Structure formats: C-alpha cells, structure tokens
C-alpha cells in the first residue's frame, strides 16, 4: 500500500467539511497513514484527538501505545498496552506487544508463560509467526532445546527470510540434540556476516566438523572464529581448538604445531586450557628428547607457569 500517497490525499481534505462522525474517520485514516510512514509525532497528535470519539477510542488507545513501542519507549508502551481491556478488539494484539517488550527486556520466562496461551488466540498471521520466534528463542535462552526446536522450526518454515538469531538458536539446539546435519544448515546460514554471532557460529561449525573427523574443515572454521575480534572467550576457545585440530591433522609439521600452542599460551596465559597446552608442549619435547628446543620454547613464553619452570629445571639438570 502507498500510505504516503494516501496521506497526501487525506491531507487535502479539510476536516471541517465533515460532521463529527466523518471527521473521526478522516483523522484515523490520516493517523494510520502516518504510522505506516513512521511519522509518529503526527500520528500521535491525531490519535489523541480521537480519545473521546466513541467509534475510535479503542483504536486511539492501542495505536498510541504502539507509538510508544515504535519509539523504543518500552516502559510507557508496557503501561499503555497493559491498560487495554480484555473486551477490546485489540486485546490480543496488545498482549503480543507486551510479549515483545518482555522479550526485548530478556524476561524469557515471562515470554514463555504469556506466549503459550497467546498462541492459542486468533492473532494476525504475522504476529503468530513472530510469536513462534520469540517463544523459540526464549526457550533456547532458558536452556529448553526440545521446546525451542518446535517453535523455531515452525517460524523458519513460515517465513522467506528468517531472523539470524532464530537460525543460530535453532542450529545450536539441533547441535545439542546431536543432529549435526541440521545444525550445520542453520548455524552455517549465519556465517555470512562479520559480527559476534558469526564468530560463535564458526566455533560451532568447527566443533561439528570435529565430530565428522573433518580436521581440515574444523581448523578452517576455528581459525575464522579466532580471527574475529568480538568475543574474547570465543577467540580463546577457537584458538585452542584450532591448535588441536592442526596438531591432530598430521599435515602440520611438529615444530609448527608446538609453535601454535606456544602462541596460545602467550596470548592467553591464564586460559582454562593452559594446563592441557603445557602438557602437550612438555610431553612433545620430552618424548622426542629435543631438550634444546624445549628450553627455547619455555624461554619464549611471556609468563611461564610453575609447571613450565619445573620442566625447564628438569631439562637443565
């Protein structure tokens, strides 16, 4: 619909040309066009004039609440939507936006509690579809993978371009269930950007390739996750797994493999993986009796641990 063109037409009609009933109709049509062209100030001004209009008072209350929501004033919107009575024609839609507000505020338990009942109500198709997404993502955040999969699958199947957050959540839930093929499809779909979600997606892709024993693909995915600067914890885990995949692949020379672990310790000296990495380095050199390079490796560390210093003493004496 061309709301801008319709608005120009309505603006050319003087309100004084109509009686009270028709004037209210004109004001509402103007306000509705303004809402759809994102002229929220103009829409609110006309909607406020309809508060006392018996034909449009419910419309006024609902759409004024929507104006607050569209502006991002969620506290005011929540108060206004909550004030809409249950016998109003807009009650279901108001409850939908209350769920949206809870979702934006990360009140996932509240979304699930209210959303399940609301899904049984007669909502516009677009709202019901979006409600499935919110319920699915909320269940994902609450750790309820089985419930999340049902809602998110319904959502993804109903839209042409699913939200990346929904695809990622569905992929992670499928991963937790052990359905790695579906997980790859959904998680892989969000690696088309350069952001924190894509970084996490590459980490999951690497883990799934490890399950398939596809070490080269795993290493590539881990490397991409590590090189993205967004989340340091993800970078740490990705670098550790990248080094592991390279060391297990058999195609990386021993010296290069150890160098990767050495770089890891220099970048993440306090890592939860540090002890495992130190064991790998120490055992590798001791097994090969390459004591000179063992010393060089330990001395190259910026902050060698007590374990590494003990290994150094063993080499020296």
Label every model-predicted segment.
Residues 1-317:
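Acidic, polar-rich low-complexity tracts and alpha-helical solenoid repeat scaffolds
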